[in-house]
Regions:
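Long, Lys/Arg- and hydrophobic-enriched amphipathic alpha-helices
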Residues: 18-176
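Conserved beta-strand signature within the Rossmann-like core of class I S-adenosyl-L-methionine
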Residues: 1-14, 55-63
Length: 176
């Protein structure tokens, strides 16, 4: 699909390159009338990042979707001032698409990487975030501390909510 940058009007373009068709076949199998965002160049960029790391952890975080549950109409969308708008590439909005983190995961160099796909909820809970409210007794003995702890609990709960930010996919590659 080609998009007019001024109007957002779409029209069919030429067939994808063979490498992009191969990526689609493996990572986003399509039936007629469906659409996808080709992630081959993103996967190549991620592989390049991993190839430069000699030791450490590379983390990618995104809404994500697995190969067995790709959205039938793609995920391309636009945002302006935090509001969802049509993805017209005229510079008036940010344009984004969800990442096929499973395809990125497959780019890891064999033998020198530990790869994990998880959710933000699970990753942050493993780091000790719980979103648990402080004991109510603290409100009586140390009200300011209670309010700080309550605010922190609310922030943590937002980060790990599985229907919100906690549903983000996390791809972690440990190298070295």
């Amino acid at each position: 699909v080609l998009v007019d940058p001024a109007t957002g009007r779409e029209r069919l373009g030429p067939p994808p390159e063979p490498a992009d068709l191969a990526w689609l076949e493996r990572w986003w199998p399509l039936s007629p009338g469906r659409r996808a965002e080709i992630g081959r160049t993103r996967d190549e960029a991620w592989a390049s990042v991993l190839g430069r790391l000699t030791r450490g952890r590379a983390i990618a975080v995104d809404y994500a979707h697995p190969v067995d549950n790709r959205p039938p109409c793609g995920t391309l969308c636009g945002y302006r001032d935090g509001t969802l708008v049509p993805p017209i590439p005229d510079g008036s909005c940010d344009i984004t698409a969800h990442v096929a983190l499973d395809s990125c995961a497959a780019t890891a160099p064999a033998g020198r990487t530990v790869t994990r796909l998880t959710t933000q909820r699970e990753a942050l809970r493993a780091l000790g975030l719980t979103g648990a409210r402080p004991p109510i007794e603290l409100a009586h003995t140390a009200p300011r501390e209670y309010l700080r702890a309550l605010a922190r609990a609310g922030e943590e709960a937002e980060l790990i909510d599985p229907t919100g930010l906690g549903g983000f996919g996390w791809l972690c590659h440990d190298i070295g």
